[in-house]
Amino acid sequence: MDVVRRLEQAEYYVDLLFKMIDEEKCPFYSLIIKKKARKKDIERILKLCEKLNEKYVVEKAEGLLLFDALLDQFEKALPHQLEVYETAEALAKQGLFVPLMNEFLRMIAKG
């Protein structure tokens, strides 16, 4: 089997596996697959989210109420395939960086 056929077969299997995923349990992973985001972009975003979440917790404990700079960093770091609201919602639903993502969702909803 040549390389192209093997790649096509692998893509077919991935599509089938994706259909088996419960999107309610893993909405962020589903979003990554649907949008065909690259591994290195997602790894970079997750590292950034860890840092932003830590910063959010500290700033919130200090009494800060405005987190526009954190949202701006998050939004600018997203690959073009991912929309900020959809991504924050998927991360929160999957239980990742929940306080930070909920804050982002509130901020976006307020406009």
Short names for language-model regions:
Residues E23-E75:
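Amphipathic alpha-helical interaction modules
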Residues M1-L31:
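Long, leucine- and charge-enriched amphipathic alpha-helices
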Residues L17, E24, Y56-E59, G63, ...:
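Short secondary-structure junctions and interdomain/linker hinges
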Residues V3-R6, A10, R38, I45, ...:
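Intrinsic-disorder-associated interaction segments
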Residues F74-G111:
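Amphipathic alpha-helical binding modules
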